[in-house]
């Protein structure tokens, strides 16, 4: 028989073990914090003054997301918020993150950013989330630290390995030491914004696969709110089981009446300008007129990026606000000013991503822009007939452009194509903004379209499927 160890010796042994583990755990945490992207969290200094929803706007969609978070009977663990470029997804994610933080729902957040090196790749995603989890769920801190102290190479392992060693196993260890119900009052929402801003479509698909497996295989207790543009590879990932069964989708469309919110935003911001501008006493009244505000609302096409860009341009203490608004409307020459630089940068990035098919895509854009006034129902089938394209090829050509235009699915060929942004036409037809690569010369485009119409009408035996399906709505 083994000799009986006196109780006081056991206590001393446990105390020694604890004293050894504490510095070891702290060393592991220090290693972790060297391999994170601290600027990715919702309240980081790097993201000072991040975009968020203007007061009294986006109330319906914010409430829908918060209802999903608190619904204890829901069957889904992912909420995918998607919509066109510039629709305001990041502002909604930021506002939800702040609301969740206030209510102690937020476990962690990661805001991807295409232009910042440690926030545009998958490499630091899990370590950054873990660094936030050890604060929001302190019971796992020691277990995470010891795991990294014992095996620092975890910091360069795959995302799956990191989730298992730094999230799953620490949660299991904390459950053993703290009881099965220790997570009942801990935050369980993880927010990921701008998934499409992570480099490489393969990385974006991989992230979704890893997160899905963390729920499906390891049953981690978290729910994920993700936001992105509706890029083809992301849509396809969410369409496949089991992720499709685990996901609630929210599309930012006209259901949420964005024009109403944009009007509220513009009216509020113009009031701020009138109250704060150094020459406010001399501003005309009323300014701007209701008609001018309505023009801006219509030009925004439901996308907040246009409205916010306009306000940033006009809200300058060094310029006369009515003159700046005239530049926006094209009444006054813009000179060297670049009022739409932010929007132009967005359009350029999206169009460059479709570079393999850009020449044909621009032909399609020209048809949409210059036949629009004929009130035609311009469907994929019509485009293929008019441009003599192979049947079905339109869906391939436009597959990377879903963030700036509505493209029906292949089994909805009778639905029309349309731009999400009315301002896209202004960009494409302004050489100073779109440059040599994407510029559409109005005269050349009109001439080419007329020549196509004449050629096809003069050659009825050519086998053309051309017909003009006038819109009935």
Where are the predicted features?
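Conserved NB-ARC/NACHT P-loop NTPase core of NLR-like innate immune receptors
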Residues: 2-455, 464, 469
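Acidic, metal/cofactor-coordinating or nucleic-acid-engaging core segments within structured domains
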Residues: 458
């Amino acid at each position: 028989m083994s000799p009986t160890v006196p109780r006081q010796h056991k206590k001393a042994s446990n105390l020694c073990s604890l004293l050894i583990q504490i510095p070891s755990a702290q060393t592991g945490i220090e290693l972790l914090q060297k391999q994170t992207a601290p600027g990715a969290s919702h309240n980081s200094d790097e993201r000072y003054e991040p975009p968020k929803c203007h007061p009294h706007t986006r109330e319906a969609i914010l409430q829908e997301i918060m209802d999903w978070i608190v619904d204890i009977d829901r069957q889904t663990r992912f909420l995918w918020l998607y919509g066109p470029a510039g629709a305001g997804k990041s502002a909604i994610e930021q506002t939800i993150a702040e609301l969740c933080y206030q209510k102690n729902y937020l476990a962690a957040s990661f805001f991807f950013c295409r232009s910042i090196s440690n926030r545009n790749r998958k490499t630091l995603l899990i370590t950054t989330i873990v660094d936030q989890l050890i604060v929001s769920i302190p019971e796992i801190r020691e277990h995470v630290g010891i795991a990294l102290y014992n095996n620092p190479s975890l910091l360069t392992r795959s995302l799956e390995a990191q989730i298992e060693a730094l999230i799953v196993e620490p949660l299991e260890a904390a459950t053993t030491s703290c009881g099965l119900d220790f997570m009942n009052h801990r935050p369980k929402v993880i927010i990921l914004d701008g998934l499409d801003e992570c480099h490489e479509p393969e990385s974006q698909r991989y992230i979704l696969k890893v997160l899905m497996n963390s729920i499906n295989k390891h049953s981690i207790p978290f729910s994920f709110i993700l936001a992105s543009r509706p890029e083809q590879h992301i849509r396809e990932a969410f369409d496949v089981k089991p992720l499709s069964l685990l996901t609630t989708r929210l599309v930012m469309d006209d259901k949420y009446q964005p024009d109403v919110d944009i009007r509220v935003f513009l009216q509020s911001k113009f009031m701020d300008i009138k109250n704060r501008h150094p020459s406010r006493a001399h501003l005309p009244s009323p300014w701007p007129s209701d008609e001018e505000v309505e023009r801006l609302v219509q030009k925004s096409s439901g996308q907040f990026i246009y409205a916010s860009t306009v306000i940033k341009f006009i809200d300058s203490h060094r310029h006369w606000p009515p003159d700046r608004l005239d530049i926006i409307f094209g009444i006054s020459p813009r000179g060297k000013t670049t009022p739409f630089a932010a929007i132009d940068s967005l359009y350029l990035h999206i169009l460059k991503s479709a570079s393999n098919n850009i020449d044909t895509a621009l032909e399609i854009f020209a048809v949409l822009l210059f036949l629009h006034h004929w009130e035609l129902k311009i469907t994929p089938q019509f485009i293929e007939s008019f441009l003599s394209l192979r049947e079905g090829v339109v869906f391939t050509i436009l597959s990377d452009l879903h963030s700036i235009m509505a493209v029906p699915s292949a089994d909805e060929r009778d639905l029309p194509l349309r731009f999400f942004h009315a301002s896209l036409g202004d960009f494409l037809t302004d050489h100073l903004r779109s440059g040599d690569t994407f510029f559409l010369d109005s005269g050349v485009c009109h001439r080419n379209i007329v020549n196509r119409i004449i050629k096809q009408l003069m050659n009825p035996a050519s086998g053309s499927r051309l017909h003009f399906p006038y819109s009935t709505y």
